[in-house]
């Protein structure tokens, strides 16, 4: 089982236990959308936004998991990665469920991005990325469970792994570099 799937399963369980009406994919997409729109990596602001999305204050275990999710996203952006890690079901999950989760991820991203105040207008390229995400959010369940469907899903997922980086470069707050130790 991959780390990505372990995190997805863990979040699914936590959200189900707390009777929260949000999928792990939507939650992760929401966080990434906020970060890419310029919300930064403030823990308190993320916990507040997550509580609003979840429809109530999360319990301690879920709060800790939300903090870990923020750390994972921060790591993606601070490590100079060329793609983000998406919180989605593994490849063994039926294609229809993976496609639904991908659509939920896009919905969450668009909501997080849209709810975050930004300065200035977007470039045409950034607007195109957001339009693509809106279209992908509507595709839920429309891919056939076939080799072509798998190929289409993988291509869309790979696109979505790099698309947030363009939006982050345009709108996101630069990461604060870690303080360098002083030598005495």
Swiss-Prot record:
Q: Which GO terms describe its cellular component?
A: cytosol
| InterPro entries the record matches | YgfB-like, YgfB-like_sf
Q: Which cysteines are joined by disulfide bonds?
A: none
Pfam name, any one: UPF0149
Q: Which PANTHER family match?
A: UPF0149 PROTEIN YGFB
State the family named in the UniProt similarity comment for this chain: Belongs to the UPF0149 family.
Q: Please identify the protein, giving its name as recorded.
A: UPF0149 protein PA5225
User: What organism does the UniProt record list as the source?
Assistant: Pseudomonas aeruginosa (strain ATCC 15692 / DSM 22644 / CIP 104116 / JCM 14847 / LMG 12228 / 1C / PRS 101 / PAO1)
